[in-house]
Amino acid sequence: MHYLAVVVLFPLLFWGLSLGCGLLVERLAGTALPSLLVLPVGFGVLVVVSQFTTWTAPTAPLTPVILLALALLGMTVGRAALVQRWRARSGGWWLGPVAGVACYLIVAAPVIFAGRLTFSGYLLDTTGAIQLAGAERLLHHAHDFSTTVPIYGTTLGAYFGNGYPSGGHSVLASIGWLSGQDLIWLYSPLQALELSLAALVFAWLARRAGLSRLMATIVGTVASVPALVYAYALMGSIKEMTVLPMLVLMGALIACASELRTAVGVRAALPFVIAGAAALDAIGIAASPWVALFGAAALLAAVPLRGRRDIRSFVIGGATLAAGTALIGLPTVGPLSKTLKLAEGVSNSNATAVSDPGNLLRPLKFLQTLGVWLGESHRVEPRYLNQTYVLIGIVVVCIGFGFLWLLRRRSWAILVFLTASVIVWALLHRHGTTWTDGKLLMLLSPIAVFVALIGAFGVMRTRGLEGLILVGAVLVGVLGSDALLYHGTNLAPTQRFSELASIGTRYAGVGPTLATDFEEYDLYLLRKLEVDIPGAAYSGPFQFAAGFSGQYGHSYDLDALALPSVERFRTIVMRRSPAWSRPPSNYRLLWRGRYYTVWRRTGPAPLAHFPLGTGFTPSAVPPCRVIRRVATQARQAGGRIAYAQRPLNLPVDLARSVRSPAIFPSTDLEGRPQFSFGGPARLEAGLRVPVAGRYELWLAGDVDRPLEVLVDDRRIGAPSAQSGDDGTVIDVAAANLSAGPHSIRLLRHGGDLRPDDAGSTVIDGIVLAPPGAAAEAETVQSVAPSAWRSLCGRPLDWIELT
C-alpha cells in the first residue's frame, strides 16, 4: 500500500496542487496561460509560498495546509476556466500532458520497476540524508538549526544554517506531509515529477516552433531526460531538479510575453516573477544570471523599443519584474550576505572548492551536454565509446538543422531563449569549479537535445526517411543512455532502511545514541535518538583505542573506540555482523532484528576494558599471562573479572581464491583483499572446518543481482539488492558442515532488465560463524580474581575489570 501511495498517489497530489496553484495565478494575472504552462507556474507557487511559510517557526508547520488551501482556492476560482478549456479542446489535446506523464515514468522507472519502496543513486551522493533531514526540520522548526544534538545539529547548521537554498526541500516536506509517506521514499519520485513539468514546457515550446502535437510530445519527453539530466536525477540532485523546470518556464514565457502583456498589461509579469523567484529559492543567488537575462528578453519581447513611450513602459516593466522577483524571492534574497558567501564558497575563487570535485571522478566533458552517454555512469567514459561518439555526431548535425528550422520559422523568442542559456552557461563556467561546472553542463543539456530534436523532426517534415533516421538516432542515443543508467543505478536497501526507521520510531527520545556503522542515512532515520557516528564528517568528540584513528566513511567495531567514548552513550545501535564485538558488560540487549541490534546502558561503566580479537575474528584465546595481569589489577581494585565468551569465527582467505577474469582485485578501507564483479563471474575458495556443526555463512560487501552461494556444490542462498557503506555484511544462510575441508563458490550470472541489475557486486569477506558467535548471542559472566585460571584456553571477545 505504501508503494502505491508513493508511485501513484503522491504524483497525483503533486500535479493536483500544481494545477490548483497555477489556476490561481491565472486568476490573479487576469489572463489564461498556455495550458501546458499552468502546472509549471503552479509549482513555482508551491516553491515560493513554502519558502515564505517556512521562514518563521510559527508558520512552518502550517505550510502543507496553506499549500492545500491555495490549490483548492485556485480550483474554485479557476473552475470556469477549466470547463472552458475542456469545451474548447481540440483533437489530440491529451498528447501534451502525455509528455509529462511519460517523463515521470522514465525518471521514476528504477523505483517503479523495483516494485518496492526504495530510491536510486544510493551511496553515490553522500548528502542525501542531509537533504532529507533538512527538509524535515524546515517543516517543524523553520530555519532554526540551533540544536545541541552533535552530528545532527552540526551537519544541518553547516548546510542550511549558512544560506543553503531550500526551495525543493520545503516542497518535498510539505507534500510529503500531505501524502502521509516518509520523505526518504518520496525523494526520487519528487525529482521525477519536477522533470515532468520541464517536459510540459518543452512540449509547448516544440508546438510553438511549428511541430505537430505528436512530435511536440516526443520532443518534450526526451528533451527533459538527456543522459546527464537523468544521471543527476537518479543521484538525487534536488536543487538542480527543482530549478530546471523554472529555467525552462522562464524561456517559454519569453515566447508568450507579448500576448500576455497585450491582454492584461503589467499583471502579465506575475508568472515570470514567480518562476524567477522560485529559481532563486531553488539554487540561490546562482540563478540570478538566468533570471536577469531571461527577464530582460521577456521584457523586450513584451515591450519592443520603438519610441519614447516604449522606453517608459520598458522601465516600468523592468522595475516591476525586478521588484516583484526580489519581493517574492525574499527568503533567498533577504539574507543576501549569507547567500553571497555561499555562492563564493563554491566558486573558483575558493581554493577548497576548486580542490573538491564532489563525487565526480573527473571533470565532465562538454560533449556530455549533447544527451548521449552509453554507460552506467556519467562519471567515467561510456561503456560503448564508439557508438556514443557516433550518436553525438548525429546530435550535433541535428542541432544545426534545429537552428535552421527555427530561423526559417522566425521563432525569434525561442532562439533568444536558447542563446541566453548558452551565454549564462559561459558566464558561470568562467567562475565554476569541477563540481559546479558539471551541474552547469547538466542544466544546458536539455536545451541541446531540444534543438536537436527540433532539427530532426524538421528534416522529417521535408525529407521523411532521412528525418526518421535522424529522429530514431537521437531517441536511441538519449533513451538508450537512460536505460543503461537505469540498469546501473544502485537502489537503497528497503528492508534494512525500514528496520532502521522502526528503531528510530520505537526508541525515540532515548539518546544519546551511538551508531558505529557508517551509514549516512542514520542521520535522518535515527534523528530522534540523538545519534552520533564516529565515521561521519561532522561527528562528535571520539577517542580511539590504540592503533585506530577517526576517518571519514569508516565503520568501527566498539573495541576500536576508547571506553569513555562508548560509555557516554545511553543507547547503541549496531549492525548484526560476525566482525562486531559485544558492547561492554553494562549494556544489555534491548532488541534484535534481521539487520540491527539495540543495546541499553544499565549500570556503571567497567573500570577497564581489554579487547581481544581483530577483523572478522572478534574473539581470541588470550594468553594466561594476560588474564593473570587483569586478575592482579582486579584484586588490587577490589573488583571482579567480567568476560564475554565467544566461539572463534572461520574467515575465508580470499587472497588464495580462484577467480574469473571478470573479477577485479583491490583492497578495502581496512586493507583486506576486495573483489569487484564486472559481469557474470565465479569466485571459489576453500577452508578447513575444525569441528562439525551448524555454521552461519556471511558475505562482506555489496550485492546487486542475485549472487548464488554454494558450499560443496550445494546451493545455500542467493542474496540480492543488499548494499551499504563500509562494513556491510550479508547473512546468507546456515549450513551443517562436517569437520574437514570445504569449498565455497560465488556465482554471479547474467543480468536482466531490472534496475540495479548492473549496479555493484563487491566482496571483501566470507565468514563462517559457529552457533553463539554473534555479539547478541554472548552472555556476560564474571569470576573472582582468584579464579582467573578458569579463563585460560577459552575464546573470549573481551575481558573487563568491574
What are the functions of these language-model segments?
Residues 102-246, 383:
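Active-site lumenal/periplasmic loops and adjacent helix-entry segments of GT-C-fold
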Residues 1-94, 568, 797:
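Membrane-embedded, hydrophobic transmembrane alpha-helices
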Residues 85-89, 93-94, 207-209, 214, ...:
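Membrane-interface helix-loop-helix junctions at transmembrane boundaries of multi-pass membrane enzymes
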Residues 105-106, 282-287, 331-335, 426, ...:
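Transmembrane alpha-helical segments
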Residues 129, 192-193, 240, 244-246, ...:
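Hydrophobic/aromatic-rich transmembrane helices and adjacent perimembrane loops
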Residues 267-276, 316-326, 450, 456-482, ...:
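Signature aromatic-anchored transmembrane alpha helix within multi-pass, membrane-resident enzymes
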Residues 476-481, 486-497, 502-549, 565, ...:
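Short periplasmic/luminal acceptor-recognition loop of GT-C membrane glycosyltransferases, typified by
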Residues 298-306, 316-326, 369-411, 458, ...:
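Hydrophobic, aromatic-rich transmembrane alpha-helices
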